[in-house]
Structures are given as C-alpha cells and as structure tokens.
Amino acid sequence: FHVLLYRFLDRTGKGLRTAPRDALIAESAPKEALGRAYGLHRSLDTLGATLGPFLAFLLLPLLGFRGVFWLSALPALLAFLLLFAVRETPRPPSPLPPLALGHLSPGYRRFLLVSGLFALALSSNAFLLLRLKELGLSQAGVALAYALYNLLYALLAYPLGGLADRVGLGRMVATGFGLYALVYLGFAWARTAFWALGFLFLYALYSAAFEGANRAYLATLVPEEAKAGAIGLYHTVVGVLLL
C-alpha cells in the first residue's frame, strides 16, 4: 500500500511540475534557440535516468533499499532549493480564462489534434523490450540494450535540438512522426534480435529528435500570457489519450 501511495505521489508531482517547467524553459531561452534548450533538458534528464539506476545498483549492497531511497531524495531536495534562485519575469495576471481553448491560436489547436492522434499510437518502451526478448535476446542483453538506448538518446538530444533550430522545429517534429512509424514497422518486420536492435537504436534517434523539438515547437504556438496553461492542456490531452 505504501509503495502504491508514494508512486501515486510521484506521478502527481510529475504532473504538477511538467507544464511550469516547460514554460520556464521557453521563457528562459531565446526563441531561435528553443530546440537546443529543450534538447539540453532532455539530454540531462535522460542521462540522469540512465546513471541513477546504475548508481542505485552499486549502492544497494552497501545501503540497502531504504538507504538508496533516502539517498535518492537528496537530488530532488537540492533541485527544490535551487528553484528559489530562479527569478521569473514579472507580468500582469493573464486576461484569458483558464484553459479557454477558443482563445488559443488555430496552430495550437491543430497541433493539439495531431498530437492527440499520435498519442493513440504511442506505446510503452516495455513493448519494444519484450519484442527483443521474444526474438531471443537474454534478460541481461535486453537491460544492456535499453541502457545503450538511453545513452544514445542523451548524447543526441542536444545536437539534434540545435539542428531543429536550423531546419525548423515543425520539420523536425514531422521527421519524428515518420521515424516512429518506421521503428514500429521495423519491429514488426524483424525476425532476429540483430535487426530489432538496429531499430531500437533508430528509436533512440527518434526520441532525441522528437522529444525536445516537440516541446520547443509547442512553446512557439502558445501566447506568452497563457503559456503554462496551454502547455498543461497539451500534456493533459496527450496523457489521457496515452491511456
């Protein structure tokens, strides 16, 4: 029961922080460098998600589960304290009603529709890993492949964010849609783990190209005075349709 409760609180915290965080990134970065800014965020976030479990694995024999959980709370506490050093630009209260979709741009509404449809096709990374196991990869091999996927994602996210700034955020998002379709077609076609691994690493390219560019492109479609609310609505719609 306690594990379920804390997991629920963890997901609640993620829901509360995502929209304001993305809005802060959008306000803190020049418009011509949004791809790099979000790419850097995705890179560091993924790198942390890769190194964290590895460190936990090393520390588990020394500290036990409770010790690892206590130690894991320290980075979150440090991040919370660092937020007090962030200074937001003062602005008058938003004149728009909360989540007034009709007041948002047609471009945003179209992007919300496209993203919602895309969310219906999204599935958990676990399905790809199960496919690797089905094709004969060992449990250890699957774990190593997923670690390499995350590492490649982390290494590529920032440079591909910069590329998105140069070629256009919308084009990079469209490229991401195409890569995702190609990856899932590839996993359906693959008859050996070798080919599936190739498509898993192509999936890392998709993640690095799409995740940052998608958030950056969204930030260009929402009004300054309703940025956090519009981003929050986007994540709500996509999150519900993912279920």
List the predicted regions and their residue ranges.
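Helix-loop boundary and gating motifs at the non-cytosolic
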Residues: 108-145
